[in-house]
Amino acid sequence: MENKAMYLHATVSDRDSSSIFEEPFDGRSLSKLNLCEDGPCHKGRAGGCCTQLGSLSALKHAVLGLYLLVFLILVGIFILAVSRPRSSPDDLKALTRNVNRLNESFRDLQLRLLQAPLQGELSEQVWKAHDALQNQSDSLLALAGAVQRLEGALWGLQAQAAQSEQAVVLLRERAAQQSDAAQLELYQLQVDSNRSQLLLRRHAGLLDGLARRVGALSDELADVGGALRGLNLSLSYDVALQGTRLRDLRVLVSNASEDARRLRLAHRGLELQLKQELAVLNGVTEDLRLKDWEHSIALRNITLAKGPPGPKGDPGDAGKEGEPGIPGLPGLRGLPGERGTPGLPGPKGDEGKLGATGPMGMRGFKGDRGPKGEKGEKGDRTVDASGVEAVMVRLVNGSGLHQGRVEVYHERRWGTVCDDGWDKKDGDVVCRMLGFPGAEDVHRTAQFGQGTGRIWMDDVACKGTEESIFRCSFSKWGVTNCGHAEDAGVTCKRH
């Protein structure tokens, strides 16, 4: 009995020192509480061996060992439940029910042992305890299986927890990467924002400068507008002044044309008078030639001989005061003065209306024919016009009448001819005017000396068939660009 009890105690002690996860609980070992199983009195339960082994102390030790074992199991279960995360709720509930059932069974067993009599039906109580322990061993086996399943579930939960931790680590790394990327993007956004602010400030400065320039330009435009208005006023005044001067010039030109017409009429009268005098002179000359041919030849030789210069004559009387000349043209406009301060703009004047152009006057009616005049007296012998024109041309400073510097008579004074375009055709016309058959040679560049006074003719272009040099084409009377160093001359052919 004591040996069996010691064996049971040792078994319980070994199970206490070992882990319930290393060696599962075997409830069949409690069957050793059958005290008559190994003894010599195994076959008879009412003998003396059973009575010797029916000690209550062994039963008490067994019950205490069983309580201790159950306590250790409960402690291990609670440690696992506390240390392992998230166990299965169904397994925990089943385990709790089994433990509660086991506790109730042990309590009933303890009460029965304490209330059982010491002498009466001890063997029956032992066998009942044996049966109860047998049943409790089955329950413990089921409880051990549940604990093993719970342990497997805990190991699975642990593996899942490790995977979850790895996933959490990966998530943390990814979160850290995302945080770094977000910080980098935030930094870039800040840099872009700073750049945008700088650009906005720069653009604002440019806009301010542009606004100032526009303001200055508007002021300059206003000044230019004022200057243009002043210039317009001055130009309008100048235009009006020029219009007045033009009207005055028109009046002067009309007066000059009237004077020219009068002079032309007077010139025609003088020309007629001169022709008459020349006719008289020719008649006298012809008479002289007829009366005394020798005297005429002597007289011609005398006229051709150049005598010594006569004494200087007395100064003539002062002529009459001439008419006032035409007012001269206005001088060039002076340089503009310094720019004055712009004055206040005056009120805008009313725009004047353009005057209507006067109607052109009607042509006057043809006058009545005057009465027929009385028959005049018989006139003197006429002279050929070529002879008159011949008197208006002469050759000067030559070795004879056939050569010299060509001079023409115009406006009661003698003048020279420029050698521009002067050729033999021109010389032929001049020589025929003087009674010679033609020109032997023409001369330029004042070969017979420089004349004095006006240069009446320039750019003379004769065809060679004209009767007078005055019928050749030339520039206007007195219009020339030559000097007396270009006076023309001619040498005529003799008979």
UniProtKB/Swiss-Prot annotation:
Keywords: Cell membrane, Coiled coil, Disulfide bond, Glycoprotein, Ion transport, Iron, Iron transport, Membrane, Receptor, Signal-anchor, Transmembrane, Transmembrane helix, Transport. GO terms for cellular component: cell surface; plasma membrane. Residues 303-382 are annotated as: Disordered. SUPFAM superfamilies: SRCR-like. GO terms for molecular function: ferritin receptor activity. The keyword tRNA processing does not apply. Residues 1-61 are cytoplasmic. The chain crosses the membrane at residues 62-82. It is a single-pass type II membrane protein. Residues 306-357 form the Collagen-like domain. Disulfide bonds join 418-482, 431-492, 462-472. Residues 92-112 form a coiled coil. SMART domains: SR (SM00202). Residues 324-342 have a biased composition (Low complexity). Residues 314-323, 365-382 have a biased composition (Basic and acidic residues). Its main location: membrane. The keyword tRNA-binding does not apply. GO terms for biological process: cellular response to heat; endocytosis; intracellular iron ion homeostasis; iron ion transmembrane transport; protein homotrimerization. It comes from the Eukaryota. Residues 393-493 form the SRCR domain. Homotrimer. Belongs to the SCARA5 family. Ferritin receptor that mediates non-transferrin-dependent delivery of iron. Mediates cellular uptake of ferritin-bound iron by stimulating ferritin endocytosis from the cell surface with consequent iron delivery within the cell. Delivery of iron to cells by ferritin is required for the development of specific cell types, suggesting the existence of cell type-specific mechanisms of iron traffic in organogenesis, which alternatively utilize transferrin or non-transferrin iron delivery pathways. Ferritin mediates iron uptake in capsule cells of the developing kidney. This is Scavenger receptor class A member 5. It comes from Bos taurus. The lineage of its organism: Eukaryota, Metazoa, Chordata, Craniata, Vertebrata.
